[in-house]
Structure formats: C-alpha cells, structure tokens
C-alpha cells in the first residue's frame, strides 16, 4: 500500500476518503476491514459495509473473507424493519403513470392539451421517465406535497404544465400507497431511520464503511447518522465526486461536498495515485470534469505515460466492433452500454472473462479492459 492508503487504513476517526477511479479504493477498504478485526479494535459483527448496487456488494464479498455484513442501503433497511409487517409497493408507480396516460389523460381535455404542448419538446415515453425520476428525487429528499404545490404556483408556462401532471400522479400514487398499506423504497429507508432513532430497533454496528458515498441521498445519510448516534459508531465514507452518476434516483452530490456540515470533526483524506490509466488520459478527463466548478479540485498522479492515448475508430456496424476488438484483449473485459437493449444490438455472448453491464450497474467494479 502507498502512504495515502496506509493513512486511510489506520484512521479511526470519522473519515471521508476521496478515492478516484483506479486509485486502489477496494483494496484499501479490504485492508481496513482486516486491520480493524486483526487488531481487535472491532468484532466482525460490529462492522457494516454498504455499497450502492448488488454488483458492487458482490464484488466486495468476493474479495473479503471476513464474516461481516456487506449490503445495500435497501437491504439494510429491509433487515431493520423485517418484523414490522411492511409491504413493498413493487411497480405501483410505473402502473399509475401508465394508467394516467392511457385513460385519464385521454379523456380529460385540459390534461390532454397540456401533454400535447409538452410533447412538442419530448416523447410520451421520455415524459413518463421524467415523471418517475422527479417523484423519486422528491421523495428521497423529504420534500412535502405542500412544497410541490408552492413550486407549481410559482411556475410559468411549460414548467407549470410539467408540474400539473406530476402533481396529479404524485397525489394518486401517495393515495394508492396509503390505501393499500404499502411503501416504496424511499419510505423503506425513512421508516428504518425512524425505528433506529426512536430506539425501537437495534443494530450491532459500531464501524460503518460506505462505498460510493458520492451516490447518496438525505434519507440514506440520515439512516447511517441515526446508527452513528445511537451506537456511537464511526463512519468511513469512500467516494469520488467525479464519479457521481445516480442523480436520477434521488441522490445529491452536495452531501458529499458539504460533509462537514453533518460531521464537523470529520477527517478528509485523498488517494491521489492512479494505477489504472496513463497521465495523459487522466489530465484530459480532469480538464473535462473541472468544467463544473462545484467539483473538488484534486491532483491525480500516474507513473504511466502514453502519447496520444485516445483514439477514435469508426466501424460500419455494431457487430464489427465486437469481432474486431475483443479477440485482441487479454484478461477480463467489460462492455458498457446505455441500457440492456445494447447487449442484444451488439449480439454480445458473455463468458467468464467477457461481461456486459449498463453504465449504472458497472459502477464501482473493476476489469482489465
């Protein structure tokens, strides 16, 4: 381990480790777990590791041979409330959105006109996705229906049209959840936090490691802060503001950037050595990312150099790309696509060393190519 990684492993305070892609983040997490257990600072049952996706959780499990809890936020919340007669809503929101457009919107003249105005700029399919995204964002950050009404009343023109439809669907959705006695994933985490805060449920965790912390929401943060308060636990946040991609599901990068507002005495460390790329590629990527002035400026160092590292190659069709490039690669290879449809468009046949994942599902994983 390099000096920065050693500092991170040895830190016993609340810590934010800013770890860029290729900096040995997972290696550092595994070594920290081993250090905490081997030195008898914490017992295995007292350590909790949280990551964002099932894929990243499974990746850590494969690399960690300790009997500790490694889970997602949602599975943690389910474990906390499992005896509370709690029922998940499933695809209720998708169903309500589709029903709204297929029945009510077609028969209600005013709503139909609103949709036609909006769809000058987008499609019905995209509009449905925007609405689902908005509601998830809204609920994940504790916003109330009154706030949404105020936003609607202050809006003008096309924004007001959007909000009218969102308000309709949001109200129907909340009523359906209440009448059926079900809850969505946002409610799941909120209620788990309440059970911990009110001392109704207890968990054994005294050291919490949160991977991909840049991808968090206020509801998730409050859940771990509740555990921290009740158990006097320490938290080891690991993340990189350059890699935040889950805004669509209610996540807020400001939590990462302003972590001292929530834990004033937190120690902030950085992993600045990149083992994956060359310096030229890193410099180009950083120049692009820093166009957003809200990002944390950091110097990333690499021992590799490569003249003109980026090449643009044009192919006549998608299948040619796979046939031309894949045979020349060694080790494990990941092909990333925008959605699952790309896997079939490219006719990708997965093997032990060749995997296809969407960009979102690949978050936090490591491959040779």
List the predicted regions and their residue ranges:
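Inter-lobe coupling/hinge region of RecA-like P-loop helicase motors
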Residues: 1-21, 175, 265-273, 294-337, ...
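Conserved SAM-binding loop
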Residues: 49, 70, 209, 237, ...
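A short beta-strand element within the Helicase C-terminal
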Residues: 355-369
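Conserved RecA-like helicase ATPase core segment
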Residues: 218-311
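Conserved helicase motor "Helicase C" RecA-like lobe of SF1/SF2 P-loop NTPases
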Residues: 341-353
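P-loop NTPase Walker
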Residues: 1-88
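ATP-hydrolysis module of ASCE/P-loop NTPase motor domains
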Residues: 85-168
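Conserved helicase NTPase motor core
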Residues: 1-18, 158-254, 273, 364
